[in-house]
Amino acid sequence: MDSLEEPQKKVFKARKTMRVSDRQQLEAVYKVKEELLKTDVKLLNGNHENGDLDPTSPLENMDYIKDKEEVNGIEEICFDPEGSKAEWKETPCILSVNVKNKQDDDLNCEPLSPHNITPEPVSKLPAEPVSGDPAPGDLDAGDPASGVLASGDSTSGDPTSSEPSSSDAASGDATSGDAPSGDVSPGDATSGDATADDLSSGDPTSSDPIPGEPVPVEPISGDCAADDIASSEITSVDLASGAPASTDPASDDLASGDLSSSELASDDLATGELASDELTSESTFDRTFEPKSVPVCEPVPEIDNIEPSSNKDDDFLEKNGADEKLEQIQSKDSLDEKNKADNNIDANEETLETDDTTICSDRPPENEKKVEEDIITELALGEDAISSSMEIDQGEKNEDETSADLVETINENVIEDNKSENILENTDSMETDEIIPILEKLAPSEDELTCFSKTSLLPIDETNPDLEEKMESSFGSPSKQESSESLPKEAFLVLSDEEDISGEKDESEVISQNETCSPAEVESNEKDNKPEEEEQVIHEDDERPSEKNEFSRRKRSKSEDMDNVQSKRRRYMEEEYEAEFQVKITAKGDINQKLQKVIQWLLEEKLCALQCAVFDKTLAELKTRVEKIECNKRHKTVLTELQAKIARLTKRFEAAKEDLKKRHEHPPNPPVSPGKTVNDVNSNNNMSYRNAGTVRQMLESKRNVSESAPPSFQTPVNTVSSTNLVTPPAVVSSQPKLQTPVTSGSLTATSVLPAPNTATVVATTQVPSGNPQPTISLQPLPVILHVPVAVSSQPQLLQSHPGTLVTNQPSGNVEFISVQSPPTVSGLTKNPVSLPSLPNPTKPNNVPSVPSPSIQRNPTASAAPLGTTLAVQAVPTAHSIVQATRTSLPTVGPSGLYSPSTNRGPIQMKIPISAFSTSSAAEQNSNTTPRIENQTNKTIDASVSKKAADSTSQCGKATGSDSSGVIDLTMDDEESGASQDPKKLNHTPVSTMSSSQPVSRPLQPIQPAPPLQPSGVPTSGPSQTTIHLLPTAPTTVNVTHRPVTQVTTRLPVPRAPANHQVVYTTLPAPPAQAPLRGTVMQAPAVRQVNPQNSVTVRVPQTTTYVVNNGLTLGSTGPQLTVHHRPPQVHTEPPRPVHPAPLPEAPQPQRLPPEAASTSLPQKPHLKLARVQSQNGIVLSWSVLEVDRSCATVDSYHLYAYHEEPSATVPSQWKKIGEVKALPLPMACTLTQFVSGSKYYFAVRAKDIYGRFGPFCDPQSTDVISSTQSS
């Protein structure tokens, strides 16, 4: 057992702080061991929980016990029985002798032996898993354990059946005997206790032998002789055991006769002699272990043993019990086996005490193992050496066995005293052994349960059989619980909760054993081997002390059990196991109940732990299932999203193809002759629109309607232009040429000019100068590409001839896009001419390249990319107008051109040139943008005319553009997303168109935004979103729009209704420029029109004009970047964003004086992006330039607008969140959208003073489509 003990000890130590996982692993190991043991001892199950083993059980146990004997022998060798015997001897002396005598006696006198043996075995088993006692004996004796058990259980029949009886009798009635044995007083005290007593005290011989241990020499049964009286005592003990004795005899015969007697005799003799010498009780005990058949010879020692055993068992029970409880619970299978062995022991013990048997049963697994090892060891080493070493080993083993015997111990009340002594004897070894039990206890629930039963057995030896049975049936028995409950009260001392079980058991057992050793001293003795020796002496001298020990032992074991239970519980709960602990426990007669309670607690806890484990396992399984299901759902969602996107793209491609076809069909309505006035152009455009289709017709009608308004718009445009740029105003004057020049300067100047330019353009008036008609046409043009002012590469939009829009790609190469509406075309044509010259492919996106010739002029504009863009656009517009008859429309086209190259921003502007025109514009922009983003071109194209939309299709974006109308030029070049944008932001730009001026301004702001729009729209939707260009950068478009817008605005409104594009058109712009703002007001109406729908508007022609104008404006606007509200400090949240104007910003009640020196937060630039992996939209925003004069931003407020065909009111903008300000750029992801819907998003900043900055230009996106992917 030494070897065993040490490894186990190591294990235990490892376990001290074991986590649940470690414990589980240990449990698994133990289970395997148990299973092996089970295979070795099939009886385990039989005698498992109830001490009563089937007669067969003992036999099996006996086999096991035999093995155990060897182990015990080895263990004995490992431990110097004498060394430990002395310690153990206090209890063990008697115990050992008793055990051996008992065992021998048990063999001889099964009844006593069983009882005594039971206790002894229990103690032995605990010490040397009585298994040795009965096991070997049992094995040999056929029932030493069995014999005892068998005898008690089988042979004893009494013990077994009588377990209570035999145990009672023998054990003092396992139950009663246990109590008696354990108590030495309970009814079976006579038999059990008496036996025990007899053994111990009653059996003076036993006692004498036990104390004398010389008797052990008298190996009557091996130990009988060894135990002094072993035979006589066995006899007397057995006799004392009475029935047990007679019962035991059978068992004894088996045990003693077989192994018990012979082996016990020999082992006991050897061990007994050794034990005798050493306190045979230990050696005997060990022998008992060793012989396990010898245990049969433990009748006499049984009494003492019973007492010591009881105590020992109690201690063991407590410690081992606690340990064993875990161990047993863990190793319940093991326990079963052990029980078999122990049951054999228990058989002996059981004979002695049913409880013992039960304990044995519970304990047996461990005991069995230990016994096996012990027996093997003992056998291997030789009985004498074995006995002495065994004593120590047995001490260890006893500890293990004791822990194994915990159950035994429990049922060992009788044995308790003996056990106590044995335990004390085995304390040293038990410490190590106990560690193992503790480990086992810690790890296995089985052991724990078993331990519980053992513990309950300990408390009530008499009751134990029943308890054991109860425990077998249900781990917690009321009596056990009672005992556990009372234990703490009695003398429950727990040094460390965590360590209680293991440590407590280890040291506690030792201490308890020591204490038990001196029953009287038990309380006073802690970790006192000397006390143990004294106890031994006392036991030897006094059976009473043994009994006392038994009691104290019991008490201790009970309190220990309680400690163990609690500590175990704690340990289990905390997942930390500390094994080192010493506890003094003093218990009185009610220990049994207390122990029972403790055991019940332990069992309940174990059950709870098991249930928790099962629950955790089930929970983990459920979690995995749920995860799998969720994963599947996610995959499905992704699939549906992808499918929806594919479907959308398919539709767009189809639309684009149709657009291309249409374009080819009416490539360009003959462009208005250059000479034609804008009005002419407008007429042409109108015609074109009609030709183009209903959308165009609508646009046209809108245009016509707008035409009257245009003048006023123009005025605003002019105003805007003046505000934006002086030159633009000039342009506004409607001198396209003028505008052109203005554009250049103004472009550079900033978006302002663009507005005027736009005005000019819008005013088609430019050429017509006053011509409202042209203006109107421009409006239809809502195309107002938002050419980003940046369009400086106006070249982009060059139209080579009226029919064609020329898009200068960034490179500046010209791309001709045929404009559908001839009028538009003609306008464009003129423009194109200019554009070509313009072609500063400067358009490189940044430069507001006014698509139109103006743009070429724009080169200057290029210089000032954003600002310029507008100007340039304006210029192009002017140029276009001038060149092309002032038709301007064409100019617009260039404007559209404008931004793509310039800035995506401008494009973003989205020229909301007339709702549809947007679409055209978008298309145009697209065309333009191609270079930039296609958007610009489309925008231009759009502006050029509805055809523009067609051209957009050409661009590729074009496809979307017509229907989409909102091509999203806003994308401006970079953001081919413009088309998307249209959805989300583009509309805003379109709005801009409506209020051309405002738009312009916004446009510039938009510029930043365009990226937003552009991202989604340009590609697929450019045509669609045409205007959506949202050329953020190129506010140009807006600017252009602005002029146009004014004209357009009104028109846009009308056409807006026709084309929703209007909606978005205006909005963006207004934010961009103050003048625009005014325009915006007008635009609002337009805005209200759903700019988005406008996309559909074929109006491109009109759009075209508008676009040009818009572009022009855009040039100025670029600074504004329509998309970004910031530019328009005046928060115009309510601007007709897409479907509805943004909500007004509440004014803080009071501003601190510091706020006066700071300006409102800047207008952010918003970009949208689709998240492909999940159905989400990423909003990212930043500012174009950091304004140091602004107050610190506290948070950003996000608003969302779900587009609905019904009324559009600011209240439809819902605040979806507030994000604490972090260093820009910032981004957040939104999810959970209604698929197939269009959403608009806007962001505004709130500074630390509670003031709200302007909204960014709203950005739109289709939830299902990937338009918005930027």
UniProtKB/Swiss-Prot annotation:
GO terms for biological process: DNA methylation-dependent constitutive heterochromatin formation; negative regulation of DNA-templated transcription; negative regulation of transcription by RNA polymerase II; positive regulation of DNA-templated transcription; regulation of DNA-templated transcription. The keyword Aminoacyl-tRNA synthetase does not apply. Residues 617-665 form a coiled coil. Signal peptide: none annotated. Residues 1160-1270 form the Fibronectin type-III domain. Keywords: Acetylation, Activator, Coiled coil, Host-virus interaction, Isopeptide bond, Nucleus, Phosphoprotein, Repressor, Transcription, Transcription regulation, Ubl conjugation. Detected at low levels in breast, lung and stomach; highly up-regulated in the corresponding cancerous tissues (at protein level). Disulfide bonds: none annotated. It comes from the Eukaryota. A motif (Nuclear localization signal) lies at residues 553-571. The modification Phosphoserine is found at S57, S113, S445, S473, S474, S477, S479, S496, S559, S673, S899. The modification N-acetylmethionine is found at M1. Recruiter that couples transcriptional factors to general transcription apparatus and thereby modulates transcription regulation and chromatin formation. Can both act as an activator or a repressor depending on the context. Required for HUSH-mediated heterochromatin formation and gene silencing. Mediates MBD1-dependent transcriptional repression, probably by recruiting complexes containing SETDB1. Stabilizes SETDB1, is required to stimulate histone methyltransferase activity of SETDB1 and facilitates the conversion of dimethylated to trimethylated H3 'Lys-9' (H3K9me3). Belongs to the MCAF family. This is Activating transcription factor 7-interacting protein 1. It comes from Homo sapiens. The gene is ATF7IP.
